[in-house]
């Protein structure tokens, strides 16, 4: 089974790229972030034409997440955590895979910049709420796959120039501690189980020739609860999509399960 995750930075602008990706890579699930559209304007019919259904938690012009799928799903939840700002950042579905009930969660974590504003405090509050949710899931021994744009650079090997990012909301010590806390509570960073090498990024700024110079960040992740991390067969970054005309500034990450 293949699950991909991609911050598309506008589903309407990137629709042709999405359709081609689905046809080429044939994931069973595609988790989208920053779709930047309301549900009524989501391209359901175009996706249906190539064999995919969609569950969408949209928002006008900002944020928004979706799960595109060609397998049976159950128990759709459009608000995994309580968000007092009512931003569209989470969606989850349950699936059966190899006789296991697994919850797939698509997340778009707040960016948090600038750090001296309410945006950073919102990110902290959001992460605390998400962590509380995961602790509860762990107590219930749930099997979880979390995929999405976490807006967190986990380690210095996940950013081209760590010194430049020390006070950024994606890399501050406080933020990285949240990521480690989640891992310590019973989750694995799927990519790092497979690939220990530095300079593997999922995001490159549109400016300064960042992609060509590989000045990027690894901020898009798959986290799996340890009770199913043995199913991980491979995790790759589909960087070729970043070379297309009018690309997203993120590349998809692809999780293959045995």
Regions found by a protein language model. Give the residues of each.
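Active-site beta-strand termini and strand-to-loop segments that position acidic
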Residues: 70-71, 93-99, 225-226, 248, ...
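Conserved beta strand-loop-helix elements of the APE1-like EEP
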Residues: 61-76, 198, 210-231, 257
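Surface polyanion/phosphate-binding segment centered on an Asp-His-Pro turn
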Residues: 236-258
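N-terminal, active-site-proximal structural segment of metallo-dependent hydrolase catalytic domains
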Residues: 1-50, 62-65, 154
């Amino acid at each position: 089974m293949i699950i991909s995750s991609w911050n598309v930075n506008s589903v309407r602008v990137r629709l042709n790229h999405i359709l081609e990706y689905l046809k080429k890579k044939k994931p069973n699930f595609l988790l989208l972030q920053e779709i930047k559209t309301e549900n009524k304007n989501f391209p359901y019919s175009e996706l249906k034409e190539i064999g995919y259904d969609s569950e969408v938690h949209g928002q006008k012009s900002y944020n928004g997440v979706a799960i595109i799928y060609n397998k049976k799903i159950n128990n759709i939840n459009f608000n995994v955590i309580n968000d007092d700002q009512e931003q569209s950042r989470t969606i989850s579905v349950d699936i059966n895979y190899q006789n296991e009930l697994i919850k797939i969660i698509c997340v778009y974590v707040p960016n948090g910049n600038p750090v001296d504003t309410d945006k950073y405090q919102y990110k902290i509050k959001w992460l605390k709420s998400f962590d509380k949710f995961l602790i509860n899931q762990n107590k219930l021994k749930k099997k979880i796959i979390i995929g999405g744009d976490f807006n967190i650079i986990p380690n210095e090997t996940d950013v081209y120039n760590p010194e430049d990012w020390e006070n950024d909301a994606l890399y501050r010590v406080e933020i990285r501690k949240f990521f480690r806390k989640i891992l310590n509570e019973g989750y694995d960073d799927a990519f790092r189980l497979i690939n220990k090498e530095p300079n593997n990024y999922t995001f490159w700024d549109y400016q300064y020739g960042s992609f060509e110079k590989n000045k990027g960040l690894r901020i898009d992740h798959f986290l799996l609860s340890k009770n199913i991390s043995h199913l991980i067969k491979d995790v790759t970054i589909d960087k070729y999509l970043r070379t297309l005309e009018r690309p997203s500034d993120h590349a998809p990450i692809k999780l293959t399960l045995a």
